[in-house]
């Protein structure tokens, strides 16, 4: 464990996250972990390492003094990231050196940005995860003055790589039916698919409000027993405005669930900012399984999709560290 970054300034919602918890639902603890799992796995792929802990930055990052040479990876929401004032590419891995200053400002698009470091951030773990779950009082919310430590970097030479932005899409979000979907009329389900929702102001890691001029409230006073809920479930409270659950959702709920977002599309819900348009499309369970398998293959192949960053020499603060004359000849070889 090596001290790597000293926190000068920090946003109000910067936390340590990883893949979250497995098998804790029955104990009342939701999966938690990164709100955008695709961005998390992109960080892992860029760094060429396994399931390490990262910083999740909601809306705003912070300013960090570099205490140890390291590699960092940025993914998720595009933020104004700079190293000694020079802009850093998102969805890419970069090298940082002792004495430099890393600044990560406001998000330009999306909500959750991710900062990973070679070896991962080392923080206390609970039941196998370093994730922060504010509702359960677990994990770490990063504070100014704090020193962040990293583990052993197993691939220090892997740097200067980027991933294409594969997560942006304006296509409808794929949903499948739940045990409650049949309680809604055919006309109401059709309206649900046809409605262009906007992501409401109300939202956090527990879930986001879906606003429209339509009401999807059930009539007839059906009584729904409290049942297990998971991220992706779309609940419809009494007023009829749907609410999509995210990583830190409660584990049980008594509102009817009109649909459930496929896990591969949950990151798009999480990254929607207030006012963004969202549409939903029902797919069969068989189609959903095929879509999820294709997404799993894409994620497993992320490391292979990393390509070298094409950089402008005028923007390279570490120019002297590069081999710029490789392949020179004397002239008498012809």
Question: What would you call each of these model-derived segments?
Answer:
Residues 1-334:
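Conserved "landmark" site that anchors the functional core of diverse proteins
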